[in-house]
């Protein structure tokens, strides 16, 4: 034996990979990952260290029996703390007073894996092969395609694959604050190498900060060139292990099954190093993978259990929606009564279809669920108001970070040709300075997509377009998510925009612009919102979150913000001249006869 892989040695010696890496660090042996090889001399040293470690344990085995007795006095403290925690419990199920277990006492959970890549590179074929060979016969009939995820059995344990196509679905989940996947598999065809969607998939995985494994598919084809793929990956600063980097690259064939066993092994090894754990006895939390309406059953939602255990009969809260679980189905299509961590289940019981990526929590009962939803609705309205205010007050420092620090400008680039993309990247590289870093999260050919908007919204990036324009749906989505899309057909104008972002030579200048005027004709007392000014708009228009000035006679008695507008019982954004409305100010001393003037801060276009 001249050389051996680290994970193979760990398996032979019955040692966890993490412990093996600790020993190698102590010996000063360099390695890239657990798939790196080590010399026979190093193997002998490791065996010697492990033998020495096991010897003292045998000698000291007698006094260990005292540990339980020593731990007993702590029990009354745990019991006494329980009532206090019960009183502090909120409507959504939260941790109870039992002492939190140490990290090493929390059991490991199965890794959750998503597979992404360019169309026709074999993502679906690879999933189908794994499903066919690693899932029980009763599960392999296509049922799992409706559940949105499936479980594969390996020698190392269970692996959960998310069966939701497309990296945009993956980013949709992350955009709502949930990281459902632990590992991302990037599938690249050996005869095609890197394609636009491949680069996008890699960018999305990097933005999510999840470990990546590259599966070079279709190696069975005569024209397959895996080495070209590895070389092309280095252009994205992704260096395969064979080239001295730390990127795991596995040649596979979804057609013949070649390399699939190795891929599953690497997934298990990566999961072990990530030390994935979840407490099945803790409070429940999960994520919506997908939701749909079934003609016969009604609303169905696929939930990935992340913490705790889900039971039939539990009340679940998702955003401003709730439901009681009437039935649960596992990835095999069988009815189950409970599901623990890293288990995908299809849930029947919601009245509305929940959105992908929404976080799920359990509630004690229906009343508690309704209370949570009401509170969340209030929070949402406050956030909408704050977001609208920020749109008129956003400064260069908000975009780039505090002055005096190294600031990062996140960008998504879109252009009409590859040559234009490369030219823009070259220009941006020369624009970086000591105090400013330019991070091009994604550069591609063609008009910006909804996936670009999702990526930009999660990373607070600006989308710059050269000679391409976004579609109406993409523009609307960007407006809703507060993402700036700027399109140019002259390269120098785009460069000027980059200069404004980087150097800050031109900071935004705002001026106050008159909107409208209203008379207060009655004051409406509201238990939650305080006093609302029942008013008639005599001139111009009123807009929610606009600035407000209240005058009484010749005296200005209030200056602030319009926090809400109502027409009858409906919340509205605008009210025009000649209409009555309720104006909610962050102020309760409004009186009948007062005059309210509305204005807004508008950015002045500069030469």
Curated annotation (Swiss-Prot):
Record carries keyword GTP-binding: yes
Compartment(s): Cytoplasm
CDD domains: IF2_eIF5B, IF2_mtIF2_II, mtIF2_IVc
Region (G3) residue spans: 163-166
Record region (G4): 217-220
G1 as annotated region, ranges: 117-124
Listed GO MF terms: GTP binding; GTPase activity; translation initiation factor activity
Domain of life assignment: Bacteria
Pfam families: EF-G_D2, GTP_EFTU, IF-2, IF2_N
Compositional bias segments (type: Low complexity): 62-93
UniProt domain tr-type G: residue ranges: 108-281
Ranges where the record places region Disordered: 54-93
Keywords, comma-separated and alphabetical: Cytoplasm, GTP-binding, Initiation factor, Nucleotide-binding, Protein biosynthesis
Residues annotated as binding GTP: 117-124, 163-167, 217-220
GO cellular component: cytosol
Spans annotated as G2: 142-146
InterPro entries assigned to the protein according to its UniProt record, in alphabetical order: EF-G-like_DII, IF2_II, IF2_N, P-loop_NTPase, Small_GTP-bd, T_Tr_GTP-bd_dom, TF_IF2_bacterial-like, TIF_IF2
Family, similarity comment: Belongs to the TRAFAC class translation factor GTPase superfamily. Classic translation factor GTPase family. IF-2 subfamily.
PANTHER family, A to Z: TR-TYPE G DOMAIN-CONTAINING PROTEIN, TRANSLATION INITIATION FACTOR IF-2-RELATED
Function text: One of the essential components for the initiation of protein synthesis. Protects formylmethionyl-tRNA from spontaneous hydrolysis and promotes its binding to the 30S ribosomal subunits. Also involved in the hydrolysis of GTP during the formation of the 70S ribosomal complex.
NCBIfam families, alphabetized: IF-2 (TIGR00487), small_GTP (TIGR00231)
Protein name: Translation initiation factor IF-2
Gene giving rise to this polypeptide: infB
